Amino acid sequence: MVSLINEAFKKTKNANRPALLTYTVAGDNTKKRSLEILKSISAYADICELGFPHNTPIADGGQIQTSAYRAIKNGIKINDIFEIAKKFKFSKKTTPIILMGYYNMIYQYNENKFIKKCKNSKIDGLIVVDLPYPENKNFSKKCKRKGINFIQLVSPTTSNER
C-alpha cells in the first residue's frame, strides 16, 4: 500500500523544496466552514493536518487552545471530524490528511473503532500528542495494519531511548 504522506515527501524532495504542512482545528468557525477552510488551504499544501479539539488541550499553544474552545462551543463531535475528512478526501484524493489530537478522545471512542473509522474516512496519518513511546506500541501496530501512518513527535528533550 502506497503512503500518500511518503509520496508527498518524495515529491517535495525531488523538487528540492521543503514540504508545506497546514493545520486547522475541525469545527472552528463552523463544521461547514471547516471543510471549506481545509479545501482552501489544501490548494497550497503538500499535507493537511486536521486537529480534533479537546477540552483540555495542554500540549497546544494559545491559538490552538482558543480554536479548540470555539469548535467545542460550536458543537463539533468526533463523528463530525470524520465526516469533514471523508468529504475532503472525496474531492482531494491525492492530498494526504493527518488527524491530530489527544488519546483520551480515542480511548473514549474505542481504539479499534476509531482506527477503523479513520480507515473508512481515508485518513492517511495520526498524530496523538499525549501517547509517547513505548506506550504507543500497540496503537501504532493497529494503525499500521490498517495502512495509517502513526506519526510520533520528537523534541530536543526526547531521550535516545524514546
Name what the model sees in each region:
Residues 22, 41, 51, 118:
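Conserved, mostly hydrophobic/aromatic
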Residues 5-13, 35, 40-43:
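N-terminal positively charged helical leader segments and presequences
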Residues 2-12, 54-66, 73-86, 106-113, ...:
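Active-site-adjacent beta->alpha loops and helix N-cap segments on the catalytic face
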Residues 30-42, 158-162:
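Catalytic cores of alpha/beta
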Residues 8-28, 61-67, 89-100:
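N-terminal small/glycine-rich loop or linker at the start of catalytic domains
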Residues 43-45, 121:
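Structural motif
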Residues 20-24, 48-50, 97-101, 126-128, ...:
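Hydrophobic faces of well-ordered beta-strands that scaffold small-molecule active sites
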